[in-house]
Structure formats: structure tokens, C-alpha cells
Amino acid sequence: MTQPLPGARAVSAENELDIRGLFRTLWAGKFWIIGIGLLFALIALAYTFFARQEWSATAITDRPTVNMLGGYYSQQQFLRNLDIKTDPASSDKPSVMDEAYKEFIMQLASWDTRRDFWLQTDYYKQRMVGNSKADAAMLDELINNIQFTPGDFTRAINDNVKLIAETAPDANNLLRQYVAFASQRAASHLNDELKGAWAARTVQMKAQVKRQEEVAKAIYSRRVNSIEQALKIAEQHNISRSATDVPADELPDSELFLLGRPMLQARLENLQAVGPAFDLDYFQNRAMLNTLNVGPTLDPRFQTYRYLRTPEEPVKRDSPRRAFLMIMWGIVGALIGAGVALTRRRTI
């Protein structure tokens, strides 16, 4: 059995970590560790007083109710009923509330909506420095401070929007203003679509009514002409009374003269007095056209959403997180203090 050489034993002893010695050294330098740790924690504390603060407010939204849409709902539903009459398949469309909320969500998440919102706020104007590049960079940052998260129906999560500002009241007030701003833009777009659809339906209904009138007038003219021709034949043949047992309504036009001159004259006068005959569908279309000619009554401020979580002033600051920074930098300071203590021990 071989024995380790004395030199090898000495090298092994030098490479072993002296745990007791390490802790004695750290204990001896505890004032350095605690002092530098406290110093870094105090520096972190001071930083939190001067660093820019970030507070965030959150809102959760869902589709509006019928009452919130006001007159827009009834007018849009009126147009839909016209469409269903001509095309029954159009009844499968999403509800008016769903379409209004879809437009609201589109505006809420839109980059242009966020940009236009910040440009008209005092919050942005008060922070402008007059430098185009700096102001553009700040505007871009503010745009990114409005964060929209779409809902997920599979996980029962609703749409939500978060706004970050420098103070808690600003975060709350600006988020409320932004949601209202997006809703107003959505209402404006929906009103424009309503006006366009209303005008298109008016043109269509006018064309349909005119077509029905032309058809009725053509039938009337043909009927008058048939009776006039039959009356001439009856006068030529001196037929003064009915010469057929067939009911008048069942006689073809070529045999109407058999009714006799008096009856034909009476039928002609009655037809001329009554004028063209229109069916019920024509009068319904005329009533619809009269309503369409009045035009839509637009409400520029109807609400296209409802809150499931109304924005409130946040109670906790997002950044800087004072306790976290003090603990983190206190630990960093303690590690640096431990390094200083070990270095001083070796030099001694």
C-alpha cells in the first residue's frame, strides 16, 4: 500500500476551503458588510424619490346594452328589418350590440386612436419640450403606455385596457377619458355607416316603388285599352246588352264586347275614376319610403361599451418598487461588503 508524499499532502491542505476561517473573516468584517449594504439600500431609497413614477389603471369592458345605444339601435334595427324582408338570409347577422362593440374594440386598440387621444390632452402638451424629435419620442412612449389585451372566451377573460401615467389620479382620469374618446370615435364611424346604409336603402326603395308604379300603370293602360276597343266593337255591332252568360271577369279581352255597350261604358268610367290598382306590398313600400325620406336621427355620443371594471385610482405604484429595490441593492451592497472584508483580511 502506497503512502501519499508529504508535499502532496501540503498542496491538498492548501486547496481545501477553510469554512471556519471564512466565517470568522466575514464576522470580523461584519461592519463593512452591514455598512455597505445599508449604504446601497439608502442609495436605492433616495433613487425612488427622484425616479419617474409609473402608476397604472385598468378597465374591463363588454358589449353595451340596448339602452346605451339609444336611437342608433332602433334605426339600425329598422334597416335590418328591411333587409330581412328582401333577403331572409340576412337575419343571421351579429346583433346590433355586437357590431357596435366590435367597432369600439377596433378603436380602443387602434394606434391612431391612441395617438389622436394623446395629442389633444393637457398631459402631453404640458410635457412637450419644443424639440420635435424629443416630443415624438415622448408621444411614442405615451402611445405604448396604453395597452389593450383582447379577451379570451374559452378562458372567460374579457377585454381589458391599461393606461400608465406618472400619478395615480392621472392614470385613473386619463383612462376614463381614453375609453370615452374611443367610444366617441366608434359612434362617429357607426353613424357614418348608418347614414350610408340609410341613403342606399332610400335609393333602393325609391327604385322599387317606381318599378311597382310602372307595372301598375302598364296594367291599367292595357286594361283601359282593352275596354275601349271592346266598347268600339259593341257600338259597331249595336250590342246594347250582355250577350253572354260567362262572368265578366272570366271573359278574355277578345270577347269583352259581348258584355254590351252600357256595361262596358260603366266599367270604363269606373276604371278611369279609380286609376291604377296597387297591391298591399306597394303601400307598405310607400310607407317605408316616407320614413326613409325623413333621414336618420344621429346621436353623436351614444355609448358603445359597458364597464365590467370601472377605472379607479391605483393604490400600488408599478415603478419604482421601493421595497424591492432596497432589498435587491442591499443584498448587492452586502456582497460587495463581504468582498471588501475578505480582501482586507488577506492584506492583514
UniProtKB/Swiss-Prot annotation:
Pfam family, one: Wzz
Record-linked InterPro entries: Bact_polysacc_biosynth/exp (IPR050445), LPS_length_determ_N_term (IPR003856), WzzE (IPR032895)
This protein's pathway: Bacterial outer membrane biogenesis; enterobacterial common antigen biosynthesis
Molecular functions per Gene Ontology: protein tyrosine kinase activity
GO cellular component: plasma membrane
Bilayer topology: Multi-pass membrane protein
Transmembrane parts of this sequence: 31-51, 323-343
Primary site of residence: membrane
Highest rank taxon of the organism: Bacteria
Keywords: Cell inner membrane, Cell membrane, Membrane, Transmembrane, Transmembrane helix
UniProt record, GO biological process: enterobacterial common antigen biosynthetic process
Location of this chain's protein in the cell: Cell inner membrane
Family: Belongs to the WzzB/Cld/Rol family.
Function: Modulates the polysaccharide chain length of enterobacterial common antigen (ECA).
PANTHER family reported in the protein's UniProt record: ECA POLYSACCHARIDE CHAIN LENGTH MODULATION PROTEIN, TYROSINE-PROTEIN KINASE
Subunit comment: Probably part of a complex composed of WzxE, WzyE and WzzE.
Name by which UniProt lists this protein: ECA polysaccharide chain length modulation protein
